[in-house]
Amino acid sequence: MVLSAADKSNVKAAWGKVGGNAGAYGAEALERMFLSFPTTKTYFPHFDLSHGSAQVKGHGEKVAAALTKAVGHLDDLPGTLSDLSDLHAHKLRVDPVNFKLLSHSLLVTLACHLPNDFTPAVHASLDKFLANVSTVLTSKYR
């Protein structure tokens, strides 16, 4: 799914509003995913998955950092996320559906925290962006 110029602008503007909260929102999205889709917990058997867990916060920071990097390289997501794609496909062997579940959880989290900025157009642009990220992360499964 190709991001239009308007989509890219919307994604950059929305992620800019996230600002210093990116890690916290990433952790909240993970918590939301674990609660809404309990099967996703199977990939984190060594984590304390309770609310406010340092491990979930730490992984939320990693998710947010990867997304921040992706937002900065919207024209080269495959190159930007290549190492993460390798990691998730070959070492972690994460079921590709989980990227969609995390994307959904992140959209809900952003909608909760940025209600005035989360317009239908921004929602659509972020959804397309996260779908593209998911596609790149699962590209090496084939």
Swiss-Prot record:
Official protein name in the record: Hemoglobin subunit alpha-1/2
Chain sites annotated for binding heme b: H88
Family the entry assigns: Belongs to the globin family.
Residues with the N6-acetyllysine modification: K17
Residue ranges occupied by any Globin domain in the UniProt entry: 2-142
Source organism per UniProt: Ovis aries (Sheep)
Keywords tagged on the record: Acetylation, Heme, Iron, Metal-binding, Oxygen transport, Phosphoprotein, Transport
Any Gene Ontology biological process: hydrogen peroxide catabolic process
GO molecular function: haptoglobin binding; heme binding; iron ion binding; organic acid binding; oxygen binding; oxygen carrier activity; peroxidase activity
A Pfam family assignment: Globin
Subunit structure: Heterotetramer of two alpha chains and two beta chains.
Residue positions, PTM Phosphoserine: S4, S36, S50, S103, S125, S139
Residues the record lists as binding O2: H59
GO terms for cellular component: blood microparticle; haptoglobin-hemoglobin complex; hemoglobin complex
Modified residues (Phosphothreonine): T109, T135, T138
Disulphides: none
Function: Involved in oxygen transport from the lung to the various peripheral tissues.
Modified residues (N6-succinyllysine): K8, K12, K17, K41
Xref: SUPFAM superfamilies: Globin-like
Keyword Acyltransferase included in the entry's annotation: no
Domain of life: Eukaryota
Misc. remarks from the entry: Adult sheep and other mammalian species produce unequal amounts of alpha-globin from their non-allelic loci. The alpha-1 sequence is shown.
InterPro entries in alphabetical order: Globin (IPR000971), Globin-like_sf (IPR009050), Globin/Proto (IPR012292), Hemoglobin_a-typ (IPR002338), Hemoglobin_oxygen_transport (IPR050056), Hemoglobin_pi (IPR002339)
Modified residues (Phosphotyrosine): Y25
